[in-house]
Amino acid sequence: MFYPPLPLSLGIWAEVPPKDQYGLKGGSVCLAVADTPQELAKQSWKVNSTIIVSDKKVSPKYQEKVEYNSVNHTLCIKNLSEKDRGTYIATYEKNWEESTTTYRLTVQEPISNVVIQTDIKLLANQSCSVWLLCNVSVCSNLSYTWERGNEIYSDDQQIHFSLLPADGDISVTCNASNPVSWKSASNSEV
């Protein structure tokens, strides 16, 4: 018996990955829906399967923690802590179809301290081999840039270069950042 092939488009749904959202510990973050708010119905927000907002009403459990704007369907989470991280899903109807907007919230500490560690070795030709390490107070999602004079280079935590006596003193700055903050440290005695 011959069965004709079924079109691949039947019953196949593409899932949209969550949008990454970062919040500063102790701060607040607002999550918005992707569609035009005026056209939405049956709006709700959930976090990790727990209902926060349903039919434009905030759950008593979240009254002090969130602010919900029923006009534009934005959810603002206040006084962020590690407990607030998770997957937030806005569900709503538009044109008789259910839609969702999903966020993956990560709460991070601000960078509070940046220190440059220096290791200098004098070489036989009177030049110096310089190793600099940028130490930072927090450890996740960090990015680095270094400034040496007027040059910006390297996205590593550590840099290495050589100096000749004719180079004189130079100034080096490490800029460290994560999605919620940035700090820098300078060393002008290299």
Describe these PLM feature segments.
Residues I12-P17, E109-I120:
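Proline-enriched interdomain boundary motifs that mark the N-terminal boundary
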Residues Q38-S49, Y62, V130, V136-N150:
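Solvent-exposed loop segments of extracellular immunoglobulin-like
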Residues I51-V58, Y62, R148-F161:
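Surface-exposed, flexible coil segments in extracellular/virion-facing regions
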Residues L80, Q157-S171:
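Solvent-exposed segments in extracellular or luminal domains encompassing
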Residues M1-G27, T36-E39, S44, T50, ...:
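N-terminal Sec-dependent signal peptide, specifically the hydrophobic helical h-region
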Residues S28, K61-E109:
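Ligand-binding face of N-terminal immunoglobulin V-set domains in extracellular IgSF glycoproteins
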Residues T87-P110, I152, T173-V190:
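Extracellular/luminal immunoglobulin-like beta-sandwich modules
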Residues S28-A34, L123, C128-V138:
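A short beta-strand segment in extracellular, disulfide-stabilized domains
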